[in-house]
Design a protein with these regions (language model features):
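Phosphate-handling substructures
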Residues: 63-115, 169-173
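Active-site-proximal alpha-helix that buttresses catalytic centers in soluble enzyme cores
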Residues: 2-68, 104-107
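Active-site signature of alpha/beta-hydrolase-fold catalytic machinery across serine-
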Residues: 62, 141, 145
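Generic structural signal for well-ordered alpha-helical scaffold segments
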Residues: 34-38, 114-122
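Conserved histidine-centered catalytic loops in small-molecule metabolism enzymes
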Residues: 41-71, 173-199
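Acidic, low-complexity terminal tails and accessory targeting/binding regions
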Residues: 2, 75-87, 94-95, 126, ...
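Beta-strand elements within well-structured catalytic alpha/beta cores of enzymes
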Residues: 3-8, 49, 127-138
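Glycine-rich phosphate-binding loop signature in dinucleotide/nucleotide-binding domains
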Residues: 41-44, 120-128
């Protein structure tokens, strides 16, 4: 079996003056990443890949393992903020080709994420665990290959993610949190959600 742990980056600072790619982790985000990475699954990580966005690679650094960045692991490009529809978040799950002006659809994002994760999976040996630090929409886009995703509450960004009839998540994707993907013969056989967030 091979295991890929898809990790949503930890909590960034809130600063609308910075480009989204340059947002660093907040002090709380640093602590939260350390808490997540203290869990057993992360003791057996053999390799780490990260989005090049600062909040992602700053999260990856907390694993204390050398890592590579891959531009394909970046967050979904929202496009022109002036033309962003108020209902965009919900519409994207109704139509996976839906996109804002100059932005990416979930299908666009799924295509590049699938290529990146597929290459990572092919490079792994049985028994290995690889961590991939990326972003919530990018993770969801990839999971659409095997999962159904339903918007439960658009204003709160609450999703129901189902895999072969099993509920993987019914809530928000915490920052940080992880989806543990287990593969047999390079085919996805199970997904589990992992978070240290207190409800």
């Amino acid at each position: 079996m091979k295991t890929i742990v898809l990790i949503r980056h930890s909590e960034p600072i809130k600063d609308r003056t910075l480009p989204t790619a340059l947002l660093p982790l907040s002090e709380r985000g640093i602590i939260m990443a350390q808490e997540l990475f203290s869990l057993d699954i992360f003791r057996s990580v053999n390799a780490v890949y990260s989005s090049p966005y600062q909040r992602a690679f700053s999260t990856a650094e907390k694993l204390c393992v050398c890592f590579s960045t891959d531009y394909r692991l970046r967050e979904r490009e929202l496009g022109n903020p002036q033309t962003l529809d108020a209902d965009f978040w919900e519409h994207q799950y109704e139509n996976h080709d839906y996109k804002n002006s100059d932005g990416e659809s979930l299908n666009d994002t799924r295509e590049r994420m699938t290529l990146a994760v597929g290459e990572i999976l092919s490079s792994m040996r049985d028994g290995e665990t690889t961590a991939v630090v990326t972003h919530a929409a990018a993770i969801c886009a990839f999971l659409l290959n095997e999962c159904s995703i339903e918007v439960v509450n658009a204003s709160e960004k609450i999703r129901r993610i189902m895999h072969h009839g099993n509920t993987v998540l019914n809530g928000k994707i915490a920052a940080p949190s992880a989806f543990i993907l287990n593969f047999e013969n390079d085919r996805l056989c199970s997904i589990n959600y992992l978070s240290t967030e207190k409800n």
